[in-house]
Amino acid sequence: MGSSSGQSGYDLSFKILLIGDSGVGKSSLLLSFISSSVEDLAPTIGVDFKIKQMKVRGKRLKLTIWDTAGQEKFRTLTSSYFRGSQGIILVYDVTKRETFLNLADIWAKEIELYSTNHDCIKMLVGNKVDRESERKVSREEGMALAKDLNCLFHECSARTRENVNGCFEELALKIMEVPSLLEEGSSSVKRKPDYRAHQGRCCSS
């Protein structure tokens, strides 16, 4: 469920999904948020997840953050993890334009196909802004695409940790503002069948 008693150590539990091409820094972004260390990581095989507890506006939050593989061969495996997500972060590499273009061409369509929460909060995140001299996607382009896809927008650097916390904190805040997401809960094990699964889509085109 989305809420919990004090015995569990948190008030609200959210499921957040990280998606995007392989190599854009999804795993590094997650590691940077979870801990203070950042490493050069091998591509994720299938799906991994981490749990982070934080306090936002007086509420104790438990974030279960799923890190999905970006390679096409894992696409069918990761599609099931869209189910029940209250927040989805679409990550691209500001130094690789193809990863940006694929957000609309591939990843937004994946959300439309597989997400069961039509009210889920989406965020576009441009990673690797520490490599400014290699930038191939302007901030203005990122903001424009985010507007087109009805997403929040941030740029950050997993390596320097610049604005990493800000991304997750704003996403959590926006989820907290949507009553249907709080009622939905984030547990795919204990949830009731989602009768709305075919009635709404999370991502507008």
Swiss-Prot record:
Membrane topology: Lipid-anchor
Keyword presence, Transit peptide: no
Chief localization: membrane
Stored InterPro entries: P-loop_NTPase, Rab, Sigma_54_int_dom_ATP-bd_1, Small_GTP-bd, Small_GTPase
Record: residues binding GTP: 20-27, 67-71, 127-130, 157-158
Covalently lipidated residues, kind S-geranylgeranyl cysteine: C202, C203
Record localization: Cell membrane
GO cellular component: plasma membrane
Short sequence motif Effector region: positions: 41-49
One record GO biological process: protein transport
Pfam families assigned: Ras
Keyword terms, alphabetized: Cell membrane, GTP-binding, Lipoprotein, Membrane, Nucleotide-binding, Prenylation, Protein transport, Transport
Domain of life of the source: Eukaryota
MF GO annotations: GTP binding; GTPase activity
The family this protein is said to belong to: Belongs to the small GTPase superfamily. Rab family.
Role description: Intracellular vesicle trafficking and protein transport.
Name of the protein in question: Ras-related protein RABC2b
Protein source organism: Arabidopsis thaliana (Mouse-ear cress)
Lineage: Eukaryota, Viridiplantae, Streptophyta, Embryophyta, Tracheophyta
